[in-house]
């Protein structure tokens, strides 16, 4: 792995892409054969077409998608993000639940794998509220 990668900077660009709510901006930071998995909700999603659809569905499922960062831990070729997903259904109050991302990158700094873990009790409560 190249020592020249600034993982914190890559993580910041990746977060900004998610906050833009633009699946294509997110995909621009992914390797072509990258994998995404929302553990407990989906199996592995692989490839640009499937990832674009999955990311678009995230924004449909969680209107006004937002992120509150609690911790960002970086390594040579990965980061771990402890965060809260916020969203606001039409005409309702903001809701939220905790999540944890483990994101791996290649030598070019492109995301090769993103695993997201949720507190499923919080997700269920947020969706039911």
Task: Give names to the regions the model predicted.
Residues 98, 102-125:
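Short beta-strand edge/turn micro-motifs at domain boundaries
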Residues 4-5, 23-76:
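A solvent-exposed, acidic/Ser-Thr-rich amphipathic alpha-helical stretch
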Residues 1-32, 127-129:
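Short, low-complexity N-terminal intrinsically disordered segments enriched in polar/charged residues
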Residues 87-96:
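Short, cysteine-centered beta-strand-loop-beta hairpins and adjacent loop/turn segments enriched
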Residues 66-67, 95-101:
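Short, surface-exposed coil-to-beta transition loops
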Residues 76-85:
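A short hydrophobic beta-strand element
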Residues 14, 26-27, 34, 47, ...:
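Hydrophobic pocket/interface hotspot
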Residues 30, 85-87, 101, 118:
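Short beta-strand segments enriched in hydrophobic/aromatic residues
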């Amino acid at each position: 792995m190249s020592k020249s990668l600034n993982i914190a900077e890559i993580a910041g660009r990746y977060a900004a892409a998610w906050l833009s709510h633009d699946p294509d901006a997110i995909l621009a930071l992914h390797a072509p054969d990258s994998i995404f998995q929302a553990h407990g909700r989906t199996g592995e999603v692989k490839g640009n077409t499937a990832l674009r659809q999955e990311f678009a569905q995230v924004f449909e499922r969680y209107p006004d998608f937002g992120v509150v960062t609690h911790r960002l831990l970086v390594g040579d070729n990965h980061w771990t993000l402890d965060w809260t997903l916020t969203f606001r259904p039409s005409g309702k109050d903001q809701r939220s639940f905790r999540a944890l991302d483990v994101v791996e990158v290649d030598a070019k700094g492109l995301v090769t794998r993103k695993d997201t873990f949720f507190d499923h009790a919080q997700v269920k409560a947020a969706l039911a509220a």
